[in-house]
Amino acid sequence: MTQDPGVFPPPSDFPEYNPDDMSGAAVFTKRPDLQGDRSPGLIDLRRYMFQLGMSGFQTFVGAPIALTPADLTAAGVEVAMIGAGLDFSYGMRGSAFGPQMVRNGEIYLPPGYGTPNQHTRVDPITELVLADYGDAPVNNQSIYASIEPIRALVREVAETGAIPFIVGGDHSLMYPNVAAMADVYGQGNVGVIHFDAHYDATDAGLGLNLTHGAPVRRLIEQGHASGHNFIQVGTRGWAPNDADLGWMRDHGFRYHNMPQVDKFGWDWVMERSIEEAADGTEYLYISIDMDVFDPAFAPGTGSPEPNGLTPREMFPILRRLGAEKNVVGVELVELNPLVDSTRATAIVANRVIREILTGIAMRKKGITDPYYFAPEAIDGGQGQDWPPPQ
């Protein structure tokens, strides 16, 4: 077929799918033996009562695994971790290995059991019922073939009442993840706070509707979320352009970019962001792109951008969101271990997970003070009279 280079999509005689190749369906088909006689519940892969991080089978935060919704329900799981190794929607491959990067990053952290957060003295690993729900089904040849299976798995978790915590994978995952939240909680009922160096609402994707730079626009265009309830934090660099910025403002976006941080300070931005998160909605979804961090702290990401946030700035707001808001879903995306031989990004990513879980555990314990510090964490060992009056 003669192809006109000015036509998009280009015409082709080559069929996209082979209906006789059963491997395509197998990627998304659950094992029939999972429906057998096993009593539902969590499966702990540790043989011993205490196991160091570098030993055994690596799971998210060392959690036991679950394979079915019945497992989640029987155990009363409150947060279910899901890997989603999708990296087909941007130019630099590698974020498909993000979930394993995070699981393996556990070897550089304390085992978690009996090791509380130092600011709050709350241990989310023992306070919450956690599970590693394995990985979402992904066709690594097609983002479009992967969207609905990922959405279905995230919805499956949310329908049990557990919080799905998705680790990617690139940021195109935001589309199926937030769409799944809308499926369960209703369109427009879930606010999104989006930490990212980039606004991810472009309409330009080489002719493709969904890339890692477009999920926000697609979610709003299709009614899964509203612009007014999209709060963006940490954006910087050379985008959006005038047209995209105009679209965002027309749709009521509230954004807190690095120019705002430079002008008013991080504390002001943090307070505004928390105040606006879930303003007018009952539920909150947290989206963290690792490139929101300055690449000095998290170099292992696909689209690094200088002048980012520091872990010291990010961790308090993540704890507070978990403690103060009704979080129903979380995603951590754009981790690329192929461009970080130091594993520093994995360490920061694991701390991001633990800080959010700490906030959720604080809420469960009834600790919602926005400025909470455990007394013994800040008294310097000096008792109640510390610190001295200013």
Residue spans of the language-model regions?
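Conserved alpha-helical scaffold segments that buttress catalytic/binding sites
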Residues: 2-390
